[in-house]
Amino acid sequence: EWNGEFLTDKKLLKELPADEVTYNGGAMVSDNSGIVFAVTGEDYKAGVLQNYLPEDSFRHFSDGTRSDEEIKRGIKDTLKDSMSCVNVSFKYYTTNPSGWGSSETQENKFESNPFNIIQNISECVERFFFNEFSFGHWKDTSVILQIDPPGSYAAIGIRNSFGLAVDPITGYLWDTENGADNFDEINLINKKFNSGWAKIQGPTDVAINSPPGYEEYQYNDPKFSWELPIGITALDFADSSMFQKYENWLFVADSNNGNIYKFQLNENRTDFVFESEFLQDKVVNLLQKDSIENESMEEILFGSNFGLISDIEFGPDGSLYVVSLLDGTIYRIYS
């Protein structure tokens, strides 16, 4: 409870997985009936909630859809990965023993802290037994959970997300999802939704099979995506008299460019409406293959130069509040 100065009478509703420093989500929202949802990322886990089937390997895919032959691996692959993991456990990393985000192995100095070495090797053992063999059910990873009151997953197959929002008119739940090398997404969360990770990122014509125990969770293409990731973060609906021109439009923020985007919804509020011909496919595509530039975003761009935006929200006063981690500032946009 908020007493006007600080929070009191705190109550633990749910412990969320956060074994790693990245890809653990954390955004929360309450719907029009007061049900509270939270989103988690993959937390560097690979299992049924990341759409791995019994015949699959636990390999992280970067984009698109892979063939069965590309997915399958044998015991030699498993042992090779495990030995590689143990080898780098004796090197110093700022991330983790698998080396994500680190320089080449030979360029890293030896780890001098024995406790770090033990922790690194324990992670390798965990990967060996759980990731490679048990097809572990990494509970509450890559999902949208119903927190209060407790309920089943609203969605599975989410790589990572910094944004949840509820349409004030329809009550529909929306999220943002961060791609790897390709495709940041905006998704409408249908009941028992499968967002596709780690088999699919971005729109596709290829169907995927939901994992055992989650057959009722169905995949649908994103409502909008960026082929070149923008570091998509928060989203909120403009339920404010100050923004009459954009009343009930969806606003979305990013961290790579410091941009805020605006999206007009159709009559059913299940899709977006665009005037630009090149946005009719619901994708901001690359200008050309292997380019580092996206198509023009002029139609959907609302504001820019906000730094690394971690959150946006329309407040009770009708203003749009923008949290910029890079600037260390909360901006207020009003008319």
Task: Label each region the model flagged.
Residues 25, 33-35, 41-299, 307, ...:
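Beta-propeller domain segments
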Residues 5, 147-149, 332-335:
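Flexible "stalk/tail and boundary" regions
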